[in-house]
C-alpha cells in the first residue's frame, strides 16, 4: 500500500532551484479544505471553536490561514502567546493551557484576555495572588485517572499522566472560584493521543458532558464550554483508514443531545484543539539521498536528520516514505533511511521496503505537518530547515527561512566571540 504525496518530482526539482533540501513543505489547499470540513462538522453547535494547538506548527502563515476559518489558538507558553498576539488573535480567541506554569505567563495570558485553563488545583491560589482576582471566565483540566479504553481496543492511561485535576478537586475549585467572582466555567480533558477512530471524541464528549451536568448540580456554576482538546489522530501508516470528521461531529452531537439537552444545558459551547488532525497530513519533509552504505545492513543517508523530524527517533514513530519518480516501482530493497546525527536512533525508517534508491533521489517523508519542524533542536550543531508553503495557485512561498550558522551562534552575542563561515 502507498500514500500519494501532494507534491511531484517535477515540482520538487523546480523548488530546489531556489530552496535547497531539506525543507518542510505545507499544502495550502489541503489545510484549507480540512479546516472548512471541521467547521462544517461542528456547525450544529453555535459556540464551536477549534483552537489550533500552536505547539504543533508554530508558524504565523499557518495560523493566519486557520484564522480565516474561525480557528483560535491553543497556547501553552509565553512565546506561543506572543505569536498568537502578533497574528492578531485576541481575547477568547486564545486558550492558554499550560502546566507547571511560570506565574508571569498567567499575567501575560490574562492581559491578552485569553481563557486560562488551569492544570492544577493549587493554581487557583497562584492565579488569584498573581492577578489579584479570579477571571470571570475560567477553565479546569480534568484527569479521571485509571485507564481510558474504547471498544476497538485503543487505550491510554490518564492515571499515569501529570496533567489535570481529579473530579473532587474540580468540584471544590469551581466552588472556590465562583465565590471569588468567576461566572463562566469550562472543562477540558485529553485522555488519548492520536486516535485513528471516529469513536474517541464522542466517547470523551459523553464522559465530559456527564461530568459538567454533575458539576452544575453540585456547584451551581454556569458551564459555558466543554473543551475536547486534541487526540483525534491521522493515519501515519498507509493501511489505516483516516478519521471522518463529519462522523465524529455527528457522534458528539448525539452525545450532546442525549446528555446536555435534557439537563437544560443546550447553550454549552464545544471547543477542540486538534493540532495533529488539522495539519499533519498537509505537511511533508523533502530530503535528498546523499550517501549509501553497505555493511551488515543497507543504509541510505539523507540530508535531513532528527533535527528536522524528531518523532521517529524519539518515539519510534512510523512516517511513510515516497521516493519521488519511483512511486510505481517495486519495493525490492530493505533500507534503513538515516540522518547524520551522532546518534544511532537518527533513523527515519528501519528495515523499510522501498524501491532502489540512488544518490540524488528526492524522498518525501509524509505527515510532518504537525510536530515536525516544531520539535526540532540544535544537537550536533545542526541547523533547522526552511518551511515552505505550496500555495493553492501552485506557487511556492517561503514561510520560514533556513537557519544559518549565525543563528546557531547568536546567543554568544554578549561575548567577544567570532566565528567564520
Role assignments for model-derived ranges:
Residues 52, 73-76, 96, 117-120, ...:
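General beta-strand structural signal in soluble alpha/beta enzymes
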Residues 58, 81, 102, 124-125, ...:
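Glycine-rich nucleotide phosphate-binding loop and flanking beta-alpha elements
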Residues 31, 55, 77, 109, ...:
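Conserved, mostly hydrophobic/aromatic
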Amino acid at each position: 500500500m502507498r500514500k500519494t504525496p501532494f507534491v511531484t518530482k517535477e515540482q520538487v526539482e523546480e523548488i530546489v532551484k531556489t530552496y535547497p533540501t531539506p525543507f518542510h513543505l505545507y499544502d495550502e489547499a489541503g489545510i484549507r479544505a480540512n479546516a472548512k470540513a471541521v467547521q462544517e462538522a461542528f456547525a450544529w453547535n453555535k459556540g464551536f471553536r477549534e483552537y489550533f494547538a500552536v505547539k504543533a506548527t508554530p508558524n504565523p502563515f499557518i495560523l493566519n490561514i486557520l484564522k480565516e476559518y474561525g480557528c483560535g489558538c491553543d497556547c501553552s507558553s509565553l512565546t506561543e502567546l506572543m505569536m498568537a498576539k502578533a497574528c492578531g488573535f485576541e481575547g477568547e480567541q486564545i486558550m492558554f493551557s499550560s502546566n507547571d506554569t511560570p506565574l508571569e505567563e498567567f499575567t501575560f495570558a490574562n492581559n491578552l484576555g485569553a481563557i486560562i485553563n488551569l492544570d492544577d488545583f493549587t493554581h487557583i491560589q497562584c492565579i488569584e495572588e498573581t492577578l489579584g482576582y479570579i477571571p470571570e471566565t475560567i477553565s479546569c483540566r480534568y484527569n479521571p485517572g485509571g485507564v481510558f479504553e474504547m471498544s476497538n481496543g485503543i487505550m491510554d492511561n490518564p492515571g499515569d499522566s501529570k496533567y489535570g485535576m481529579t473530579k473532587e478537586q474540580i468540584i471544590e475549585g469551581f466552588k472556590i472560584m465562583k465565590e471569588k467572582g468567576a461566572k463562566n466555567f469550562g472543562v477540558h480533558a485529553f485522555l488519548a493521543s492520536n486516535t485513528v477512530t471516529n469513536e474517541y471524541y464522542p466517547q470523551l464528549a459523553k464522559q465530559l458532558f456527564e461530568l459538567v451536568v454533575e458539576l452544575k448540580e453540585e456547584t451551581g456554576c454556569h458551564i459555558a464550554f466543554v473543551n475536547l482538546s486534541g487526540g483525534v489522530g491521522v493515519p501515519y501508516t498507509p493501511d489505516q483508514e483516516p478519521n471522518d470528521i463529519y462522523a465524529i461531529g455527528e457522534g458528539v452531537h448525539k452525545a450532546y443531545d442525549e446528555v446536555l439537552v435534557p439537563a437544560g444545558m443546550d447553550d454549552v459551547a464545544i471547543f477542540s484543539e486538534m493540532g495533529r488532525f488539522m495539519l499533519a497530513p498537509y505537511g511533508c519533509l523533502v530530503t535528498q539521498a546523499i550517501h549509501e552504505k553497505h555493511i551488515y545492513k543497507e543504509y541510505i543517508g539523507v540530508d535531513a536528520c532528527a533535527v528536522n523530524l524528531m518523532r521517529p527517533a524519539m518515539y519510534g514513530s512510523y512516517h511513510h516514505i515516497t521516493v519521488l519518480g519511483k512511486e510505481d516501482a517495486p519495493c525490492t530493497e530493505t533500507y534503513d533511511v538515516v540522518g547524520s546525527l551522532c546518534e544511532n536512533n537518527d533513523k527515519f525508517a528501519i528495515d523499510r521496503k522501498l524501491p532502489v534508491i540512488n544518490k540524488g533521489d528526492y524522498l518525501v517523508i509524509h505527515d510532518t505537518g504537525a510536530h515536525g519542524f516544531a520539535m526540532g533542536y540544535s544537537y550536533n550543531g545542526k541547523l533547522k530547515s526552511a518551511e515552505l508553503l505550496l500555495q493553492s495557485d501552485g506557487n511556492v512561498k517561503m514561510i520560514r527561512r533556513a537557519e544559518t550558522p549565525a543563528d546557531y551562534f547568536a546567543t554568544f552575542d554578549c561575548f567577544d566571540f567570532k566565528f567564520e563561515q
